[in-house]
């Protein structure tokens, strides 16, 4: 069973994750993980925190000589900003709990419901954990899963489809090589240069007015074998699990797979993908409006997922709120934040998709070592070609 937990606060000493169930013999390097962490910190519209942090992973267990051992993997990412908060966020009784107290919840954040649920008079106890800073740990964990996918010839790419009112035009038949090249050269991870220019202007305008912007990103996965997931129970449907993982990313408010919500607006004849057969190829679809999943099971076509991110709740022109201490109306508190973090969310989206696919692969093929799962996947693919 492949699973993980993360721990840590935004201004605590570090973020930590423990991964259990990863196969032995998987090559994993600091450089690979750090590259993905750097991507998460990039993107136009980020805030001042990114000038402080330079995320780097440290492996504390489970990896030796650049390869996983099969033991639980402990990884840690230090928070460089900790030195500015060590007295306030200290775990001991000497913590300066009366400093930087937050009592004015931000609309759209976990602040108020979290403070009520956990009976906190200082909202900092909520916002420190609910912060998207936690996603750095999930990117590190998901990057390990991505290493496994790449060893199995499964490749994925994410890109930004829209920011605010600006939508990119991205052809469905673009190769993964073209998509990767275009997104890598874009400061917004957007493969449409003209749309990117307009997005930058809209972000600048939002910054000038103290506002924030959301958007949509897409993740495509190529080389996914037939048969991951299952139709037999709701919680084994792969589309359900992928959507849940995407919705678990901070600020994500909607997820669609394939044609998604667009399928509700057209007749079935324009939704469902017709099935064909060729001796050298086997069964295949003439289109991919299902996004690579039918009945909760992968069908061999590329996976296509999109997620909608709401604008960040922290506004430099804050909205009206109420102080939880004196119940008087105030403007919401302001924490250091981004204007737009859709590109960063895209990187997190890649990571959580990679993780869920790794879990599904382990469930389907099992194995304790990389060689074992490779052999079982190869055997399965040979059988599928004969069906």
UniProtKB/Swiss-Prot annotation:
Name the positions where NADP(+) binds. Answer: 40, 46
Gene Ontology cellular component?
A: cytosol
Q: Where are the transmembrane segments?
A: none
- What Gene3D superfamilies does the annotation carry? Chorismate synthase AroC
Kindly state which keywords UniProt assigns to this record, in alphabetical order: Amino-acid biosynthesis, Aromatic amino acid biosynthesis, FAD, Flavoprotein, FMN, Lyase, NADP
Write down the Pfam families for this protein, in alphabetical order: Chorismate_synt (PF01264)
Q: Which reaction does it catalyse?
A: 5-O-(1-carboxyvinyl)-3-phosphoshikimate = chorismate + phosphate
* Positions with a binding annotation for FMN: 129-131, 250-251, 295, 310-314, 336
- GO molecular function (one): chorismate synthase activity
Give the main EC class.
lyase
| Alphabetical list of PROSITE patterns matching this protein | CHORISMATE_SYNTHASE_1, CHORISMATE_SYNTHASE_2, CHORISMATE_SYNTHASE_3
Note describing how the cofactor binds:
Reduced FMN (FMNH(2)).
Q: Which GO terms describe its biological process?
A: amino acid biosynthetic process; aromatic amino acid family biosynthetic process; chorismate biosynthetic process
Pathway(s) of this molecule? Metabolic intermediate biosynthesis; chorismate biosynthesis; chorismate from D-erythrose 4-phosphate and phosphoenolpyruvate: step 7/7
Question: Which cofactor(s) are needed, names only?
Answer: FMNH2
As recorded in UniProt, its EC number(s) are 4.2.3.5
Family statement: Belongs to the chorismate synthase family.
Q: What does this protein do?
A: This reaction introduces a second double bond into the aromatic ring system.
Quaternary context:
Homotetramer.
- Which protein is depicted? Chorismate synthase
Source species: Desulforamulus reducens (strain ATCC BAA-1160 / DSM 100696 / MI-1)
